[in-house]
Structure formats: structure tokens, C-alpha cells
């Protein structure tokens, strides 16, 4: 496990070692966080909320 900081509440988040950029992790504060690559290291950011697609 990799120990990262939640960008929302600042608490620790355990992320599996084999996590890939783009994976979504839900934290106990209720935030949905996206794993991303920051200078070769895993980091977390708030995941984008996908809206409804009304296109046909």
C-alpha cells in the first residue's frame, strides 16, 4: 500500500501499490479521488464528475 494525502481533507489515504493513473478511490470523507502520475509518483486529485450526455 502507498500512503497518500487526501487533497480535500488532508487525511491519509491507503492506495494499493498496483494502482494505475485514472483509477478512482473513494475516501472516508466522501470524496471521489483520481489517482494520477505526478513526476513519476502516484498522487491524488478530486475526480471529475461526469455529467449526463444528452447527445444522440
UniProtKB/Swiss-Prot annotation:
Molecular function as annotated in GO: zinc ion binding
Pfam families xref list: Zn_ribbon_LysW
Keyword terms, alphabetized: Amino-acid biosynthesis, Arginine biosynthesis, Isopeptide bond, Lysine biosynthesis, Metal-binding, Zinc, Zinc-finger
Cross-referenced InterPro entries: LysW (IPR005906)
Zinc fingers typed TFIIB-type, residue spans: 1-34
Coiled-coil regions listed: none
Disrupted-gene phenotype: Cells lacking this gene require arginine and lysine for growth.
Gene Ontology biological-process annotations: L-arginine biosynthetic process; lysine biosynthetic process via aminoadipic acid
CDD domains: LysW
Residues reported to bind Zn(2+): 6, 9, 27, 29
PTM notes: Formation of an isopeptide bond between the gamma-carboxyl group of the C-terminal glutamate and the amino group of alpha-aminoadipate (AAA) is catalyzed by LysX. The bound AAA is then converted to L-lysine in a series of reactions catalyzed by LysZ, LysY and LysJ. Release of the product L-lysine is catalyzed by LysK. Formation of an isopeptide bond between the gamma-carboxyl group of the C-terminal glutamate and the amino group of L-glutamate is catalyzed by ArgX. The bound substrate is then sequentially converted to ornithine which is eventually converted to L-arginine.
Modified residues (5-glutamyl N2-lysine): 56
Pathway where this protein functions: Amino-acid biosynthesis; L-lysine biosynthesis via AAA pathway; Amino-acid biosynthesis; L-arginine biosynthesis
Residues with the 5-glutamyl 2-aminoadipic acid modification: 56
Cystine bridges: none
Modified residues (5-glutamyl N2-ornithine): 56
Motif EDWGE: chain residues: 50
Gene3D superfamilies attached to this UniProt entry: 2.20.28.160
Secretion signal, residue range per the UniProt entry: none
PANTHER family in the record: ALPHA-AMINOADIPATE_GLUTAMATE CARRIER PROTEIN LYSW (PTHR40393:SF2), LYSINE BIOSYNTHESIS PROTEIN-RELATED-RELATED (PTHR40393)
Subunit comment: Monomer.
Protein name: Alpha-aminoadipate/glutamate carrier protein LysW
Top-level taxonomy: Archaea, Thermoproteota, Thermoprotei, Sulfolobales, Sulfolobaceae
Amino acid at each position: 500500500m502507498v500512503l497518500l494525502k487526501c487533497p480535500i481533507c488532508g487525511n491519509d489515504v491507503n492506495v494499493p501499490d498496483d494502482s494505475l493513473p485514472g483509477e478512482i478511490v473513494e475516501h472516508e470523507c466522501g470524496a471521489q479521488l483520481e489517482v494520477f502520475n505526478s513526476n513519476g509518483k502516484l498522487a491524488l486529485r478530486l475526480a471529475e464528475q461526469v455529467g449526463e450526455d444528452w447527445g444522440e
